[in-house]
Regions:
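Structured adenosyl-cofactor binding patch, chiefly the S-adenosyl-L-methionine
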Residues: 72, 107-109, 123-137, 194-229
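Short beta->alpha connector loops at strand-helix junctions that form conserved
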Residues: 55-56, 91, 117-118, 140, ...
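RNA substrate-binding interface of SAM-dependent RNA methyltransferases
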Residues: 28, 80-166
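Active-site/ligand-binding-proximal alpha/beta "capping" segment
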Residues: 162-212
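N-terminal positively charged helical leader segments and presequences
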Residues: 1-71, 156
Length: 229
């Protein structure tokens, strides 16, 4: 399928603001009661020449929750990473909720480039879009067949794989000020392969022995916060 959906007014508004050229149409349910949101959506559709339909049956057929009253229909698109900027790299991510949360966190702290090493979830899945609260549409992202392919295209940068066997605790890490970097995180279930210990400077987020690991979205958020503060 070459198109996808935004479910809800806020993600739909973010789509219209940031990627209007890819929007096919917007559907509104007659039960939508936020006049302010309707006016924003209507204004953006008019501004960009996007069809706006008030079609309750179409919304009800597409939505996965009864409290969804706005649906954006958009064509999937591709873009490229900025080699001079900092990147988040996710190796084989499999959870759509985590992906959306990571995107939202990354955009919130100013990292706007995401590399996904295949296989990985589709960033355009409506569950990812919703978990990102529409911040996906501010993101540069690219899928790569392998980490080696990513490195070939990423430009000169420092690499920081986050691993349980990381050599340096995050809170003790010494970095060059102003460096361009990539923060690398593994799959939710398996983490990064041991071979990533040889890629740049491996890092570990220390925690108590009462748990075996951190949730991927949480670990990524901690790493992003430490590197951007």
């Amino acid at each position: 399928m070459n198109h996808s959906y935004t479910f809800g007014a806020f993600p739909t508004i973010e789509l219209l603001k940031n990627q209007p050229e890819h929007v096919l149409k917007v559907l509104l349910h007659p039960d939508m009661n936020s006049q302010a949101q309707m006016e924003i959506i209507s204004g953006l559709c008019t501004q960009h020449g996007i069809p706006l339909e008030r079609n309750g049956k179409a919304v009800e057929k597409l939505r996965d929750k009864e409290n969804i009253f706005a649906v954006g229909v958009f064509e999937k698109y591709s873009n490229v990473l900025e080699p001079e900027k900092n990147h988040i790299v996710l190796v084989n991510p499999s959870d759509m909720g985590n992906m959306g949360t990571i995107i939202r966190t990354s955009i919130g702290f100013g990292i706007e480039n995401l590399a996904i090493i295949e296989p990985g979830v589709d960033v355009f899945n409506p569950k990812v879009v919703r978990a990102s609260m529409g911040s996906l549409f501010q993101l540069n992202f690219c899928y790569f067949k392998s980490f080696e392919e990513y490195k070939e295209q990423a430009g000169s940068r420092s690499l920081y794989p986050f691993m349980l066997k990381g050599a340096v605790p995050l809170q003790e890490l010494q970095r060059e000020k102003g460096e361009t970097y990539s923060l690398i995180f593994g799959n939710e279930a398996t983490g990064l392969p041991d071979s990533f210990a040889d890629e740049g400077q491996s890092v570990v987020i220390r925690h108590t022995d009462h748990i075996d690991s951190l949730n991927l979205a949480l670990a990524t958020g901690i790493g992003i916060y430490e590197f951007t503060r």
